[in-house]
Amino acid sequence: PAEDFPEEVKIHGFDNNGAGLVTSGRLMDHYFSAAEEAIRRATQFGARSVSKKYAQRTPFYFRGNDAKGLPKLFQTGRFRFVPETPYTDLYGRHYRGGHIGFLPLYRQGGVPRSGIYTIRVRAAAVGRVHDYGKALGDFRNGDPLVMEIAAVDRRGSVTSTGNVSKMISLARIELTNEEPKWFEWQVYMEAGYEPEVRFRNGPLAAKRMVRVLTTQAAEKPEFKPFINMKPGLEKGHGVLKAYKGPRLRVWEIKVEGPHVEAWPSAGHRALYGDLTPSQLNAKTISRRLEAFAEQAFRRPPHKGELEPIQRLVTNKLREGLKPLRALKLGCQAILCSPGFLYLNLGEGELRGVALASRLSYFLWSSPPDATLLKLAAAGKLRPNLSAQVKRMLADPKSDRFVRHFVRRWLDLDNIGTMPPSADFLEYYRDNLETAMRAETEMFFRNVLDQNLPPREFLDADYSFLNRELALHYGIKGVEGNALKRVSLKGSNRGGLIGQGAFLTASANGVDTSPVVRGIYVLEKLLGYTPPSPPPDVPAIEPDIRGAVTIREQLIKHREIATCAECHRKIDPLGFALENFDAIGGWRETYEAKQPIDATGKLPGGATFKSVSEFRKRLVERQDQFNRCLTEKLMTYALGRELEIGDRPQLDAITARLKHSKTGLRDLVEAIVLSETFRTN
């Protein structure tokens, strides 16, 4: 329901800052629509929902009258044909003909209800080891084949190849089995979506494969009959039928769901309790609105707070609106009221539910659970804050804290907004965007769980990689799609500054800029935001001929008096990372083959000759990093910028980090126990 909401305003990367939250008429329209949709989905009067089964065997493509009215995804196209075998092979990449739709659910407009569905696919990986060499591009010989299950919405925009504008990746698995095997997942799908099987790491688009195989692999006997044949369906089908390279072979797809654990659901009970539509009247509706508001507001409604909504519902009932519709309207109004939309904790010392809410939204990004509310009601939350922090960080819901904080601190949500050019093929082929984010989040999670000191973010000699990310980093011996701890000893990487997400978020997707990366390091690791450049100073234009290096351009730029001081602080930090390209790959030269100079001198006089030495210089400024990290965490926890009055608490917490045994979990606990956190 909230997918069309405009993005929140970010202040220094954080979108939970109250000062930046502005409610517009357009946003209120979205709130009303989302509330109406949420109530519609939660309403479950009537008989228990029955799980349904759907199945489709090969062929997954059709021709002639069988294909009439179907989108091209299901039709035999230029390089698709109805197989004579009991299976269908996928040859190409997922985005160009390398996917299989699911006709039974397409015909009825997707799954009927949102919920958990079981998806089963009978498939195999065929031809992983081949002798086609570079004809298959960068596909690595012997690699597992990656099968992806996606949820797609074909009710909107659909391209000629069957691609859709709304696609959600649900699961991926690596296949090495050459004999058919069933694979099963339980996944959540929204109503109207349907599943799709994709060949995620297919070597080439099918159309291109026919051309490449009959030129670059023309010596292979299986392709000789087609070398001189005119391009067309016969040639395309013949080449692909003779092809012996990597193929994702699919026999059957089954879908079952939605699986209903409780009927009616918790959402339905929150709205209606145990009442049926016939039991709704002015009195029961009033009681339900009171009960629903207490859950929605995360506290009992203030005196008179519900009067406008109760009055609205009463008037609508008098006008003849049916009781069920009147209750829905009242609940919709509650979900669009300030009590629900804003986390209003009051002023002064936080107690009870207010303190429980701040703690829960900090560590779980959700309302307080029954344990917190029970302690709050009994007046026992304050003396038990330490124990609750430990309990909450051990709960899987704390993954939200890790994900939300890390992405806002390091601007990781920006990855993908300026995707790299097609020159960085591996970024798309190996799904590096997802792996990079996961690496940094898992790294943060490890530091938190192990209660390691913040210094770990600066010079840790390990990270969490899968095969694709390790190959991107030039590290051998890592197998599998799952991220695992990997030693970085002997490499140029270590700490945050060697991670792909950090390096990609500080670039623009096309090239690197020492100025942009330098500012990023200053803001994210050292806690200093340089002033904006003077309006009369021209921007640095890259020399696309490659005749002048960026260092030479910046030396010239620093001759401008108004620029010199800031660039003295910024440029060395960016040049230290110049050996990393726009997606974090290692390079020794620029595109014009000019050698990269990653040396530098910091304002304090310390010098470095490489990124490894720069990492040591950062460790020497560990106190500055500790203060920066503490300030970022407090800003996220409080939902506001720190003020002058917060400095004593910031100083006291940061001072604790000078002890080598103080870890990240200790830091989070110290923030929660601080007067600043417990006061609004």
Predicted regions and their residues:
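Low-complexity, glycine/serine/threonine/alanine-rich intrinsically disordered linker
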Residues: 1-680
